[in-house]
Design a protein with these regions (language model features):
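Beta-sheet entry/capping signal
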Residues: 239, 250, 378-380, 385
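Short glycine-/small-residue-rich flexible loop motifs, especially phosphate/cofactor-binding loops
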Residues: 42-44, 87, 329, 338, ...
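Long hydrophobic segments that form regular secondary structure
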Residues: 373-375
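Surface-exposed loop/interface segments of Gram-negative outer-membrane beta-barrel transport/assembly proteins
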Residues: 133-221, 258, 262-365, 380-384, ...
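Short, small/polar-rich motifs associated with maturation and membrane association
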Residues: 1-278, 289-291
Length: 427
């Protein structure tokens, strides 16, 4: 029966019938077909336990999860659960989901008491697969995946329709015509009348040089979201594991490679993650067992960046699109030079490829455990020691791009810069 099931808890392994606190357990079979679990182990927990929420701020594979065991609306819900992998505190996003044997979720104070204040918001215990005794067994699985934006905004890409909506809203609020659409795009009734004329006759060009000031004027129908974003992107992942051994010694070794391309049409965005795990168990004596587990994780991401123009802090693409990507604006001038809108949105930097951010992360985790059976099946003594090393590197470049506001007038944004930062963490 389910009451006879063995559950991993804060005080060791117990039968479910002997546990007083609120505990839930999920096995690898329960989650093996979960969509996205190969991308991030936390995704396999979504919707698996009543009351527990697993959220991501966006769909980037680099994004870590916020796991709230007691739901979003309870007191103290602002804290995320403590995650332990084989007894060692770990970022769940670094774990290879193929190595996971089971999840145990400790919900209430009685079951998390052993963890003190760190377990205030609940504890998730992840147990990884153990070696299988017997002849060597090699397992491989892989997949090729397609990804698509889950939410795509409805875009008004007709320049005249967009301008009419903007003009109506502005006049209703201020009872006067605007002087500018924004800090880049000027507005005048002369330009608006020309927009109506060119929209009525498609044979006209979507640009002209204003004879009074020599500047370009634009009358486009540009869908900037189609310019920036692909309809879908792809990724692939490969897992291999080797296990075997006898009564004295057994082993489990696994490796994983996951790669996903970016969603942008330019900029060479890419994400890669590699995992290696080695676990060995040696029965030195019938009553003495030594176990060692070593994990390596390497993560690399390259992404094009937008910019503020005055610092190296990236702006999100969506914010720059909201500020600068109006359908009346064009991407390039008739001579192929960048428009001001193309530079301000960040598209020029995406295409030229020299404004970017590269992140690298390396984790190494080693745990050695010794178990002594003092009285078989009655009294057990156990001790373990662990070592954790983490290194992160970030390099970022923001370079200048020239735009032309007329055949003989140009500007530049922003000033070029390059910086690097590095951090280490040893425990």
């Amino acid at each position: 029966t389910s009451l006879e099931e063995v559950v991993v808890g804060g005080y060791g392994v117990q039968k479910k019938r002997d546990i007083v606190g609120a505990v839930e357990q999920i096995t690898s079979k329960d989650i093996e077909n979960r969509i996205g679990s190969y991308q991030n182990a936390a995704r396999s927990l979504q919707g698996s336990i009543p009351g527990m929420t697993v959220t991501f701020s966006d769909g980037k594979p680099t994004r870590g999860a916020t796991v709230r065991i007691r739901g979003e609306n309870t007191i103290g819900a602002g804290g995320s659960a403590l995650v332990l992998v084989d007894g060692v505190e770990t970022d769940i996003s670094t774990v290879n989901s193929e190595d996971i044997e089971s999840y145990t979720v400790l919900k209430d104070a009685s079951s998390t008491a052993v963890y003190g204040s760190r377990g205030t918001f609940g504890v998730i215990l992840i147990t990884t697969k153990k070696p299988d005794k017997g002849q060597m067994k090699i397992t491989y699985n892989g997949s090729y995946n397609f990804y698509q934006r889950s939410v795509t905004p409805e875009i008004v890409d007709n320049g005249l329709d967009w301008t009419n909506s903007f003009l109506e809203s502005y006049i209703n609020g201020r009872a006067t015509d605007p002087a500018n659409i924004n800090n880049v795009f000027k507005f005048s009734r002369t330009w608006y009348d020309e927009l109506n004329r060119r929209n009525a006759d498609p044979s006209y060009e979507k640009w002209r040089v204003n004879p009074s000031n020599g500047r370009y004027e634009y009358f486009g129908n540009t869908n900037w979201y189609d310019i920036f974003y692909k309809d879908y992107t792809t990724g692939h992942q490969h897992n291999i594991s080797v296990t075997g051994g006898g009564d004295v010694a057994s082993y489990y070794v696994s490796g994983r490679m996951f790669e996903q391309d970016g969603i942008y049409n330019a900029g060479d965005e890419k994400y890669q993650q590699f995992n290696v795990k080695a676990k060995g168990i040696v029965n030195v004596k019938p009553w003495l067992r030594v176990e060692n587990t070593t994990d390596f994780m390497y993560r690399y991401s390259h992404q094009p960046t937008s910019h503020t123009g005055i610092s190296t802090t990236p702006m999100t693409v969506s914010r720059m699109l909201n500020h600068q990507a109006y359908p009346v604006a064009l991407v390039t001038n008739p001579d192929g030079t960048w428009t001001e809108a193309a530079v301000y949105t960040g598209w020029a930097g995406f295409v030229e490829g020299n404004s970017w951010r590269k992140d690298r992360k390396f984790d190494m985790n080693n745990r050695t455990a010794v178990t002594i059976d003092l009285l078989k099946d009655v009294l057990v003594a156990a001790a373990d020691v662990s070592f954790y090393f983490n290194q992160t590197d970030r390099r970022q470049a923001v370079n200048s791009y020239t735009y032309y506001t007329g055949p003989d007038s140009s500007g530049e944004r922003p000033s070029g810069s390059l910086y690097e930062e590095r951090s280490y963490n040893r425990q």
